[in-house]
Amino acid sequence: MDENKIIEVAHLKYEYPQASRLALNDLSVSINAGEWVAIIGHNGSGKSTFAKSLNGLLDLQSGDITIDGLPLSIETVWDIRRKIGMVFQNPDNQFVGATVEDDVAFGLENQGIERTEMQRRVQDAVDRVGMTQFMTREPSRLSGGQKQRVALAGIIAQQPEILILDEATSMLDPKGRQEVLETIHTLKQETNMTVLSITHDIDEAASADRIVMLDKGQVIDQGTPAEIFAYGQRLLDLGLDVPYPEKLKAALTKLGVPMPVDYLTTERMVDHLWTLHSKM
C-alpha cells in the first residue's frame, strides 16, 4: 500500500435485497492521509453505501478495502472501526447521554479510557467545537447545528484518524450548516485529520480538496472543486446543483458578457465583473 493512502478500495460490489441493480458496481478509489474528499452524487448513486462499507457495516459481495494499511476483514474490523469516526444525518439518533458532557464521554467509557484521560479528552473535544458553555445542557434542547457539533465532539474525543460525514449537514438550516463546516475546517487545520464528506450539498463539497462523483455505484469523475464545478450542465444532468457563481456565469454568457471558461468562486466572480466594469 502507498504510505500516503489511508483509504484504498478496489472493485467494490454490493446489492441490496430485492434491488434491481448494484448499489456499488466495481467501485474503486483511494484517499490520501490528511485529505478532505467530498463524495457527491444524486440519491441512489451509492454515496452512503460506500461510506457504510468502509467500517464493515455492510457485507460486500466482492472487493477489497484497506484502511491505514489494514485489509478489512472479520479479524480487523474492530481495529478499523477505532480508526474511523462517523457523523450521520440525524444527530438525535447518536445521542445517549443525559448531558452534552455525558454524551461526549460515552464512547470513551466503552473503550475503558482512564477517567483523568477521559475528562481531558471530553474537555478538549467540546472546546474544539465551541460547545464548552453547554457541557451540562441536555442535547435535546440544542439547535440543529449545536447538536451536530456535539455529535462531532463525541467523535473527536475518540481521536480517530478518519472522519466520515454521512450527509451530516443535510438537515440543518444555513446557519447550522455553516457552523458545522467552520468547525470541521478548524479541526482539519489543527489535526490534519482525513475527512470524507458524503453530500449532495455543493457548498459543502466546495470545502473539499477533491471531489469524487458517483453515479450508479461507480466513480464517473474526480478532480478539484474548480475542475468539477466547471462542468456546469453535466452536474445538472446528474441531478446535482451547481454553485451560484456558475449559474450567474451561465446567465451572463447568454447575455453576451465575456466570461472565462473555468470555474469562478464568488470572490473571483466579483473581481472579474469589477475588471469588466472598469474597462467600460
From Swiss-Prot:
It is a peripheral membrane protein. The keyword S-adenosyl-L-methionine does not apply. Keywords: ATP-binding, Cell membrane, Membrane, Nucleotide-binding, Translocase, Transport. It is found in: Cell membrane. ATP binds at G41, H42, N43, G44, S45, G46, K47, S48. Its main location: membrane. InterPro entries: AAA+_ATPase, ABC_transporter-like_ATP-bd, ABC_transporter-like_CS, ABC_transpr_CbiO/EcfA_su, ECF_ABC_transporter_ATP-bd, EcfA_1, P-loop_NTPase. The keyword Cell membrane applies. Residues 7-241 form the ABC transporter domain. It comes from the Bacteria. One of its GO terms (molecular function) is ATP hydrolysis activity. It is an enzyme of class 7 (translocase). SMART domains: AAA. Its EC number is 7.-.-.-. NCBIfam families: ECF_ATPase_1, PRK13635.1, PRK13648.1. Forms a stable energy-coupling factor (ECF) transporter complex composed of 2 membrane-embedded substrate-binding proteins (S component), 2 ATP-binding proteins (A component) and 2 transmembrane proteins (T component). Belongs to the ABC transporter superfamily. Energy-coupling factor EcfA family. This is Energy-coupling factor transporter ATP-binding protein EcfA1. It comes from Latilactobacillus sakei subsp. sakei (strain 23K) (Lactobacillus sakei subsp. sakei). The gene is ecfA1.
